[in-house]
């Protein structure tokens, strides 16, 4: 198997041109190319003066590989394809005495449960929120009627916070063992579009994610696992310094020496419980800021120039950063093309915002987080839970500023820069 990188074609090229370009790049006859797979497709729109092209990475099989490797020995864009297959790390023993427990059924909990089930461990997954379709109804209750269910909302429930976001599937974390390919293949197996396997910034979209996470849950169950909703963990069972299991809000105790805490970032009551039980934890840096919203057409024109609106490119995104002289950095985060700003709180009398896009990304406006990094050493000294306490103060203050009805306070950017209040907003698509 060979890999070609940096193979460029015009964005309007017919599908059959890709095979022809591979053959031409390698200098082989068409019948020598046995098969090829699209591994990645991206584009670079930074140079507005040049014609926009798709940039491909292709994995392929040829009739006689050795001569081609020798021929392109000095070409950094033609190499043996790396092995990106997932290597199973273990298998459950035949005499499995205790099933592992997974706490939380967001992205981490889903894949922890799925991988354990695939290895025969028959995990018990505990999720404090509801199954995804009932959770969706509760979430719309907050958006439309300002009625918050603290256990079923944007943060808690099947699929986790990512279900009501953009369904983004890319990360800046290096992945030398290609574990990300396993994740993408499992999503496709569960009903996500095939294109997430090769587009440079794959996303599924909120509405599609509901069916995908349901299918992944059914896979876990079919393999002998168990997924239980509305099961909030209130304590961990510890004897002689050894974990023995968990206790639920109902009083039920589940015993296991193996518990995975896939809590996400909003289970503050669970963090406090763990801290009180002597579980080691430390404060970490995080970022805080606001959501900015602007017309998607403005972003398309700025990023794509004359190609704005091209059907093969879709809605444009952006990523911006500013490094201030005082050492802090302000940057865009979780940019949602063609999406909406949504209320994302899970706690009474607090306001949190997030961004959300559907698969089509065809709403009028784009939005992004604009955040600044803060650290425990400078901004919230006082112990491992001091950052949570800072978040709670900010969220409570935002709740009051927004009218004490779960609507977020909003301000025009020009007014923010000028330091004056906003009296009227433009066209906005917000669920806050």
Regions found by a protein language model. Give the residues of each.
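Residues forming the flavin
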Residues: 1-52, 58-429
